[in-house]
A protein has these predicted regions:
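Juxta-kinase regulatory segment immediately upstream of eukaryotic protein kinase catalytic domains
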Residues: 1-17
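Structural motif
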Residues: 9, 73-76, 245
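Extracytoplasmic/secreted proteins and extracellular or luminal domains
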Residues: 12-14, 76, 216
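Short Pro/Gly-enriched beta-strand edge/turn motifs at strand-loop
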Residues: 12-19, 64, 186-188, 193-195
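A conserved long alpha-helix in the C-terminal portion of kinase-like catalytic domains
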Residues: 13, 173-183, 189, 221, ...
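ATP-binding pocket architecture of kinase catalytic cores
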Residues: 19-175
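Active-site Asp-x-Gly
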Residues: 156, 197, 201-204, 209-247
Length: 247
């Protein structure tokens, strides 16, 4: 990690040796570490998992995250961590990795319970506006950001690819879905035409739950974890799922 910091942040050897490293264990996909430099500056390094343990749609997922974060930072007013360096050469590490700014505050999921109703309302309204700005970014084709060759001209085609990839992955590891694979594939495949209503590829975060929103003093300080971002239908966003879930 210290050698990576020398390369990514331009540290000298003495600065690297005095850098403090702390593993962050809240994530479920990438490995993440907090680095504190000798001058008390802090940053985060994220390291992608080994490629032999990935689902199909997770290929090139770190490339997708970096692209989505940089695009959001450049084209919107949504607060996202600044990326200092992205390295996919595998020269210093066998996996892709990137260094980014450390956000101030706490994940919204960790502090929402002791916030006032007014503060929660303000945070969630602000989050909705941020989400709308992300969805306001438009692409040229549909599909996962990190899988350009598999992107399609229609949302119907792109969603069909996502479905088949997920089912193929499940069959490969003998995952028990609770129903037969064809019971999932058949009804969806026969109704894919309804997706033709989605005519413009929008940037979709796809994992914008409270744990990926950092807040401080009643305000959003940043949004993280864009690795599952894709060009698709904004109704795939996390909070729209509540519309169909029974209370």
């Amino acid at each position: 990690l210290r050698r990576m910091a020398v390369f990514a942040l331009g540290l000298n050897q003495q600065e690297a040796e005095s850098t403090k490293v702390r593993e962050l264990t809240g994530g479920y996909f990438n490995a993440a570490y907090e680095l504190t430099l000798a001058d008390d500056r802090q940053g985060i390094v994220k390291i992608a998992p080994c490629t032999d343990r990935l689902l199909t749609y997770e290929k090139n997922i770190m490339q997708a995250e970096v692209e989505a974060m940089r695009l959001t930072e450049e084209k919107t007013a949504v607060p996202v961590p600044h990326i200092y360096c992205y390295d996919n050469t595998h020269h210093l590490c066998n996996s892709d990795y990137f260094f980014m700014e450390k956000l101030e505050g706490l994940p919204y999921s960790e502090c929402m319970e002791w916030m006032t109703d007014t503060d929660r309302d303000q945070i969630e309204e602000s989050l909705g506006r941020c989400n709308a700005q992300i969805n306001g970014l438009k692409g040229l084709s549909f599909g996962c950001l990190g899988r350009i060759k598999e992107q399609k001209n229609s949302w119907r085609e792109a969603f069909a690819v996502l479905l088949e990839d997920a089912l193929d992955d499940g069959m490969r590891v003998s995952a028990d879905l609770g129903v037969g694979y064809e019971e999932v594939r058949s009804p969806v495949s026969h109704n894919l035409d309804v997706l033709d209503e989605v005519s413009e590829p929008a940037l979709v975060h796809w994992d914008l739950w409270a744990g990926n929103v950092f807040v401080k003093d009643g305000k959003i300080t940043g949004i993280t974890d864009f690795e599952r971002a894709l060009w698709g239908d904004p109704l795939m966003e996390h909070y729209f799922r509540m519309i169909t879930e029974p209370k």
